[in-house]
Design a protein with these regions (language model features):
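Active-site beta->alpha loop and helix N-cap motifs at the rims of alpha/beta catalytic domains
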Residues: 1-14, 19-22, 27-101, 132
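Catalytic alpha/beta core domains of metabolic enzymes, predominantly
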Residues: 92, 105-107, 112-174
Length: 174
């Protein structure tokens, strides 16, 4: 198990990194805008100086070509950048292209069930982000979703990692 921080706040990232337990970071332009603004690329590069592991950076485009262009640009910033692509038909297409043709690691995000995670795995995702807090908020069992996804990864021989994301309270991490 690895612990990632979801933030663009440099002080939060610095404090978390100091604990010695953080292995990566996930972030997006909205988090950066609410954490002091400035150039998103510069913010990501500063985070990369604080974190030794991967940093997942989310695209804002909604169409496949826009996502692809942003993903390629983000991947040029540093070899540790993992591109966050939202779960959608366009997102799956882009994931397949990035992982298969461009050798760019992808974190498919905003997933609410194991079927979505399975599709992301089949598209070649390096990471699948299941929104645990939101799954629980909807009245479903996030633990079962995580177990089903882990089982599919094991049985299918995938090397992808699961990110249990969108933790909203203590109950989400028990």
């Amino acid at each position: 198990m690895e612990l990632f921080i979801d933030s663009a706040d440099l002080e939060q990232v610095r404090q978390a990194a100091t604990l010695g337990v953080i292995r990566g970071c996930t972030t997006n332009p909205k988090l950066a805008a609410t954490s002091g603004g400035g150039d998103f690329r510069d913010r990501v590069l500063q985070i990369l100086q604080l974190i030794s592991g991967p940093v997942s950076v989310e695209v804002t485009a909604e169409d496949a070509e826009g996502m692809l262009a942003q993903a390629i640009e983000f991947s040029r910033w540093d070899e540790r950048v993992v591109v966050k692509i939202p779960m959608s038909a366009a997102g799956l297409e882009v994931t397949s292209r990035l992982e298969g043709k461009h050798d760019i690691r992808v974190n498919v995000t905003c997933m609410m069930n194991s079927n979505q995670a399975t599709l992301a795995l089949l598209a070649g995702a390096s990471y699948v982000s299941l929104f645990v807090g939101r799954i629980n908020d909807l009245g479903y069992d996030a633990d079962s979703t995580l177990r089903e996804t882990a089982h599919f990864i094991d049985q299918g021989g995938f090397s992808a990692r699961i990110i249990a994301a969108s933790m909203r309270g203590v109950a989400d991490i028990q």
